[in-house]
Each structure stands twice: as C-alpha cells, then as structure tokens.
Amino acid sequence: METSLRYATNSRSLKIHAKEKFPVNSKTRLQLHGELDTGAGVPSYFCAMIRYFFHEASTNLGVGLHYDKREKLRCLVRGKKKFPVITDEVVTFNIKGRCDFDQDLVQRNAKGAAEFDWNIWKFQKDQDLRLRIGYEMFEKVPYMQIRENNWTFNTNLKGKWNVRYDL
C-alpha cells in the first residue's frame, strides 16, 4: 500500500492518503485510494477505478467512481498520453485529461493539461529529481512540480500550492 502525508493551502489540515493497486492482468489494474482529513477526523474521499495501460503507446485510461464528502458519488473518466522528447524518456511531453460527472451523468468538472517532465536520475547519490512544468487548459493557469525522492511540491500562478511526503 502506498501512503503519503499531504498538506495544501485550500484545506488547511494535514491529510493522510492511501492507495492500493490490484493487478487484473498485464494491462489492467483495479486502483483504490482514499484520504483521511486529520483536522476533521473523517475521510475526505474514496475512489475505485479500473485503469487500462497501453504500454506500447505510453497511454493509460481510467474509469471509476469517486465518493466525496461534499459532492457525494461521481463518475470519473481520465486519460494520459506520454511522448518521449528524448529517446530514453528523460524528458517527456504529456497530455492528460479527466472529467467528473455527477450521478445523473451531467458534466461537473473537466480538467486538461499539457506538460513537460524532466527526470534527473541520480541527481546526487541516492537522489532522483523530477521537474514538471505544465499548463492547465480549463483553468488557464501554468503550474510546476518539483519531486525529490519522497517529497513533492506543486504550485501554480494563482498562488495555490501543496506538499506531499510519501511514507
């Protein structure tokens, strides 16, 4: 099980996130994840998703259900496509999108982004680094991510930020 501690400017409380991936076959897995809000002492959300991977095309698709304490049950569809900029995939250009629907299948929330990833393996001894710069198309806002081994810092030009530590 993958677990992490997360803190964001919009929540003002520490969250504990857990994710488990169950392989169905070589290209498909069931992914369960959820989050506990330590400030309120209750779960923030729970999600169950089937993810399908097209390894030869560096593409993945996912369909699932998401239960949020505020918006109740939602349907979720997401996808991501990677394009290597350099042959060893140290630098990639990624296109990703997702759309949430309410129970009546009316569109609720769409997100889409284009981004560049630069993975620097062995930046220092026992230290890997990833730099990501992207643009969220629906919110029209640039963003960036810095990831160093277990630490991840995300921010955008609207002043939002979050930090994650993978346990």
Swiss-Prot record:
Where, in residue ranges, is this chain on the Cytoplasmic side?
1-21, 66-71, 98-110, 138-142
Q: Which residues cross the membrane?
A: 22-31, 56-65, 72-81, 88-97, 111-120, 128-137, 143-152, 159-167
| Membrane-related topology note | Multi-pass membrane protein
Q: Residues on the Chloroplast intermembrane side?
A: 32-55, 82-87, 121-127, 153-158
A GO BP term here is: regulation of monoatomic anion transport
Q: Which InterPro entries match?
A: OEP21
| GO CC terms | chloroplast outer membrane; etioplast membrane; nucleus; pore complex
Cysteines engaged in disulfide bonds, as pairs: none
Keyword annotations from UniProtKB, A to Z: Chloroplast, Ion transport, Membrane, Plastid, Plastid outer membrane, Porin, Transmembrane, Transmembrane beta strand, Transport
Cell compartment(s), UniProt: Plastid, Etioplast membrane; Plastid, Chloroplast outer membrane
One MF annotation (Gene Ontology) recorded for this entry:
porin activity
Lineage top rank: taxon: Eukaryota
Q: Which PANTHER family match?
A: OUTER ENVELOPE PORE PROTEIN 21A, CHLOROPLASTIC, OUTER ENVELOPE PORE PROTEIN 21B, CHLOROPLASTIC
What the protein does comes down to:
Voltage-dependent rectifying anion channel that facilitates the translocation between chloroplast and cytoplasm of phosphorylated carbohydrates such as triosephosphate, 3-phosphoglycerate and inorganic phosphate (Pi) depending of ATP to triosephosphate ratio in the plastidial intermembrane space; in high triosephosphate/ATP conditions (e.g. photosynthesis), export of triosphosphate from chloroplast (outward rectifying channels), but in high ATP/triosephosphate conditions (e.g. dark phase), import of phosphosolutes (inward rectifying channels).
Q: What is stated as this protein's family in its record?
A: Belongs to the plastid outer envelope porin OEP21 (TC 1.B.29) family.
Q: What is this protein called?
A: Outer envelope pore protein 21A, chloroplastic
**Organism name:** Arabidopsis thaliana (Mouse-ear cress)
